[in-house]
């Protein structure tokens, strides 16, 4: 891979440092060593010691996080960690912090992402993946022995487990499996949730962990979809419906799927805690003229957007129930007292969820990013759809959404015309 200089120097309070990737083989023999000729330019904060090797490692790791497809950078992180361990072996005065152990553990876990590119042998790939994840968790454990109270290492453990479940285990599963005792994925997921800890100086890592959890829930929730699609494609009857796949009681994912509501509730609660922590510790202490590209501002808006999307996700089921009973059923069912009561219950559940979604999507708005305005408008349309037909609340919602879409459409020279037309053509 060709070398490239990677600078993070958007801030005037940063200075650049070139770090040579070491030539030696990894002490564990895990990674092919890059050439010493490769030098990577990293950016350090102005108040950090550019000669401090742990500072350089942190800068190298943060550079990789901005370019996670760059295996050269990742190999450089692992080799630098190995080198620092060897230095410590020869000099007992060298202290390796909890941050060192966290970076090393995360880097070992990240190496698994590149394994599909290295071999097509599934058995060998699984063995290598198992080695890397075991090494990552062992590095976490060694760090936790030295720093037992650090939230950073607890978050690191959660992150590694949430990577391992889909990459190593779910990738091996089929809908026909009945080997829950082999993987014990429910217990593994619960252990990841238990080790999650929010720390005021680890907001970005906490958000990354919660995003991984969100992605994992989506993978588990849609696990059967691929099998259903493949069965449908194999069918000779074009009119034949897809056959629903039902997992066996002893399938490794069954217990997790039965507890999806609790998992989404856990995700929502921890995203809210993270959002509120940043709001109180940062946003309430800065002025309105804060740079929109400030890392904490970007993170805050990303969390708000994720919360908005999550609330819309949680509103999907009651919204669907309401729409089916009120608009997709026959006239007799629409006047049935029991069906109407069920529709009203679904409506009362969905409306507050969509209102929360709108609130957080508004927090996520960026003045010069029209898509963030449209996200709000589409949520307002969803809210309008939940109000009684042709009610004042419904008409007001559609009007609000129309005003936002007109502004966004004008700013983007017609990019959102289809959405706008669909709104204006509502019966």
UniProtKB/Swiss-Prot annotation:
Q: Name one Pfam family in it.
A: Nro1
Where in or outside the cell it occurs: the entry states: Nucleus
Entry superkingdom: Eukaryota
- Keywords of this protein's UniProt record, alphabetized? Nucleus, Transcription, Transcription regulation, Translation regulation
**One GO CC term on file:** nucleus
Q: Where is the signal peptide?
A: none
InterPro entries per record: Nro1/ETT1 (IPR024318)
Q: Where is this region: Disordered?
A: 1-37
Example GO biological process: regulation of translation
Function per UniProt: Required for correct translation termination and probably involved in regulation of hypoxic gene expression.
Similarity-based family: Belongs to the ETT1 family.
Name of the protein this chain belongs to:
Enhancer of translation termination 1
Q: Which organism is it from?
A: Kluyveromyces lactis (strain ATCC 8585 / CBS 2359 / DSM 70799 / NBRC 1267 / NRRL Y-1140 / WM37)
Which gene produces this protein?
A: ETT1
């Amino acid at each position: 891979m060709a070398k490239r200089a990677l600078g993070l120097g958007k801030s005037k309070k940063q200075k650049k440092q070139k770090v040579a990737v070491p030539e030696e083989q990894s002490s564990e023999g895990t990674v092919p060593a890059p050439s010493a000729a490769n030098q990577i330019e990293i950016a350090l904060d102005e108040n950090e010691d550019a000669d401090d090797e742990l500072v350089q490692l942190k800068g190298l790791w943060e550079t990789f996080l901005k370019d996670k497809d760059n295996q050269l950078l990742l190999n450089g992180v692992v080799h630098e960690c190995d080198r620092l361990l060897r230095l410590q072996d020869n000099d007992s005065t060298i202290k390796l912090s909890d941050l060192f152990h966290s970076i090393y553990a995360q880097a070992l876990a990240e190496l698994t992402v590149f394994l599909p590119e290295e071999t097509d042998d599934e058995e060998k790939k699984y063995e290598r993946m198992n080695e890397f994840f075991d090494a990552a968790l062992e590095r976490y454990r060694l760090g936790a022995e030295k720093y037992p109270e650090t939230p950073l290492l607890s978050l690191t453990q959660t992150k590694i487990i949430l990577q391992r479940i889909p990459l190593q285990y779910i990738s091996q599963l089929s809908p026909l499996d009945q080997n829950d005792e082999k993987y014990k994925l429910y217990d593994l997921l619960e252990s990841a949730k238990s080790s999650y800890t929010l720390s005021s100086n680890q907001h970005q890592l906490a958000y990354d962990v919660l995003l991984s959890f969100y992605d994992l829930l989506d993978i588990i929730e849609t696990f059967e979809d691929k099998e259903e699609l493949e069965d449908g494609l194999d069918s000779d009857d074009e009119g034949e419906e897809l056959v629903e796949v039902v997992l066996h009681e002893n399938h490794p994912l069954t217990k997790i799927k039965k507890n999806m509501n609790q998992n989404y509730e856990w995700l929502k609660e921890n995203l809210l805690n993270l959002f509120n922590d940043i709001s109180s510790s940062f946003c309430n202490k800065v002025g309105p003229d804060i740079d929109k590209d400030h890392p904490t501002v970007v993170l805050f808006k990303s969390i708000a957007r994720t919360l908005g999307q999550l609330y819309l996700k949680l509103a999907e089921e009651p919204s669907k129930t309401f729409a089916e009973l009120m608009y997709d059923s026959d006239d007799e069912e629409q006047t049935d007292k029991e069906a109407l009561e069920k529709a009203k219950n679904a409506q009362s559940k969905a409306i507050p969820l969509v209102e929360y979604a709108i609130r957080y999507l508004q927090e996520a708005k960026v003045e010069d990013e029209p898509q963030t305005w449209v996200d709000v408008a589409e949520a307002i349309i969803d809210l309008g759809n939940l109000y009684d037909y042709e009610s004042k609340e419904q008409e007001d919602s559609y009007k609000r959404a129309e005003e936002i879409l007109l502004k966004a459409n004008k700013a983007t020279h017609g990019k959102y015309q289809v959405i706008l037309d669909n709104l204006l053509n509502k019966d």
